[in-house]
């Protein structure tokens, strides 16, 4: 799955 919950963005 793709989403803010699984992906860390800086």
From Swiss-Prot:
GO molecular function terms here? aspartic-type endopeptidase activity
Record-stated family: Belongs to the peptidase A1 family.
Protein name per UniProt: Pregnancy-associated glycoprotein 39C
Q: Where in the cell is it found?
A: Secreted, Extracellular space
One GO biological process term is: proteolysis
Lineage, opening ranks: Eukaryota, Metazoa, Chordata, Craniata, Vertebrata
- Report the GO terms under cellular component: extracellular region
Tissue specificity remark: Expressed in placenta, specifically the fetal cotyledonary tissue (FCT) (at protein level).
Q: Which UniProt keywords apply?
A: Aspartyl protease, Hydrolase, Protease, Secreted
Organism superkingdom: Eukaryota
């Amino acid at each position: 799955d793709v989403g803010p919950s699984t992906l860390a963005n800086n």
